[in-house]
Amino acid sequence: MPRTQLIADYLRAQARSRIDRVEKDDHGHNARTAIALIDAADYVTTLDEHAQVLVRLAVAGCFSGGRFDPGGEGERIVGDWHHDLGPADPAELLESLAEAAERGVALAPRPPQPRPAYP
């Protein structure tokens, strides 16, 4: 499945979650977030599969197991994102996700290196 479709599916699922969420005194936050995420999902499907931001997400390991996983920080970015707060447009959302994923890779513990055998 194309990476653009994996991201779009993820964003649409997050939008559905926001639509289903009922919170007292939300003042339309969930609705605005859902609409913004649907817009972002549509935007992603217009990107070339070799767009730099998609390559960055792939190198950071966001496409595994046949799905898009933005990591913990990326999930928080998506969860809090809408047009009133955070990135102003879908391109900025993707850029924020790529930056978060790259930070996650940089901070991840590295596996131990094998020790050379001594004669």
Identify the meaning behind each predicted range:
Residues R3-V22, Y43-G79:
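Amphipathic alpha-helical oligomerization segments
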Residues D26-L47:
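Short secondary-structure subsegments characteristic of cysteine-rich extracellular domains
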Residues P2, L6, R32, E92:
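Short, well-structured alpha-helical interface segments that form or flank functional binding sites
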Residues A8, R12, A34, I38-A41, ...:
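Generic structural concept
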Residues I19-A31, P87:
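Charged, low-complexity interaction regions
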Residues A15-R18, N30, L37, L94:
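Amphipathic coiled-coil alpha-helices
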Residues G71-P119:
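Amphipathic alpha-helical binding modules
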